[in-house]
């Protein structure tokens, strides 16, 4: 057995190669961005980044489904854009925009939704909402996003200056810095894909040769799809069990909606209370040039 025991130098080499690599060597070999994304030390979960509600992670994706016009269901209108705002401390999906617009207009609509009355928003789509299931209301005090054009544009900059909102723009290719909103996007789309197969949902073979033309399967309108997204958000807010809240007391709730209420009841909130009409008046809008 003694001849099978590695020498100290061999053990040390194995340990540093497989368990404790030299950061400088890894950076030289893979680059700083790859090291920060995949190999840097982690000292906690994303939800430990903030102790109070009011810091929102914001992102956008294109829905994996084709939609039709509500005026003429034989006409395909394309794929919707989905914007989400997720509270960092509670994991609650605080705001959403679903539509064909993209860019700053859609982003402002998502932030306005996060600040507004969710019961009225849901009622517009025929959904009866209990306020406890989607309790978020108010502007965030901090916004975390990537460096997309809509997140770095003049309109969001004016809004942040107007209300004193802090803004953090992440470096390129660093989606892991806002994991809550990235995961929420996947959860929402994965929740309905299996139920809507054959109804315009895009499969994994999209773009491949001889792949199905999913546009021909589209049957849902934008309003119908939006209602599905809203139902999914409500279910995630009130029923999803959070697993990364070990930093909180044992009596803390483990679902986003209940954790939001628990934090706000303790005064741990940095939300900015604004009136919906005031926000509409003060929110920056698009500009247009008059032409002949």
Name what the model sees in each region.
Residues 143-146, 153-163, 167-212:
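RNase H-like two-metal-ion nuclease catalytic core shared by retroviral integrases
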Residues 45-47, 52, 62, 230-292:
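C-terminal, beta-rich DNA-binding module of retroviral/retroelements integrases
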Residues 15, 59-62, 86-90, 98-102, ...:
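Short, flexible loop/turn elements at secondary-structure junctions
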Residues 97-133:
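Active-site beta-loop-alpha junctions of metal-dependent nucleic acid enzymes
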Residues 212, 216-237, 241:
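A conserved mid-domain beta-alpha-beta active-site/ligand-binding segment of alpha/beta enzyme cores
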